[in-house]
Amino acid sequence: MMSRLSVFILIALVLSVIIDVLNNSKVEGACVENCRKYCQDKGARNGKCINSNCHCYY
């Protein structure tokens, strides 16, 4: 009985870590809120959000 409980807790912990990692990568892949201003501050002419990535045009 106790071993089943510990296996269940271990599986729940592993799943929570996997979900957390996936959510963090999704946030990092999202565009900067104002992509155009972000790119212009870096010295680019313009910037656009394409496929959840900020692309700067120099």
From Swiss-Prot:
KW Signal (keyword) present: yes
**Additional comment:** Negative results: does not block the potassium channel rKv1.1/KCNA1, even at 50 uM.
Q: At which residues is there a site annotated Aromatic residue of the functional dyad? A: Y57
Q: Which InterPro entries does the record associate with it? A: Scorpion_toxin-like_sf
Which residues of this protein are annotated with the site description Basic residue of the functional dyad?
K48
Entry domain remark: Has the structural arrangement of an alpha-helix connected to a beta-sheet by disulfide bonds (CSalpha/beta).
- Tissue specificity statement from the Swiss-Prot or TrEMBL entry: Expressed by the venom gland.
Q: Name one GO molecular function term.
A: toxin activity
- Spell out the protein name for this chain: Mesomartoxin
